[in-house]
Amino acid sequence: MSRILILLIRFYQLAISPWLAPRCRFQPTCSGYAIEAVSKHGALKGGCLAARRICRCHPWGGSGYDPVP
């Protein structure tokens, strides 16, 4: 399951993201964070961490360096 999620995220990074304006407020980017979280914690916990991160990525949220726990 983790490999499928990572493939979907990589597809987004390579096929969709280049057409959008850069807008992630964090380092690493939300998609990079998602790949690292899923690789490190598995599909369920890593997916939850990635979803929480994406929910925080808005103009009134934080910004800066935010590593995967």
Curated annotation (Swiss-Prot):
It is a peripheral membrane protein. Keywords: Cell inner membrane, Cell membrane, Membrane. The keyword Metal-binding does not apply. It is found in: Cell inner membrane. Its main location: membrane. GO terms for cellular component: plasma membrane. It holds the Pfam family YidD. Could be involved in insertion of integral membrane proteins into the membrane. Belongs to the UPF0161 family. This is Putative membrane protein insertion efficiency factor.
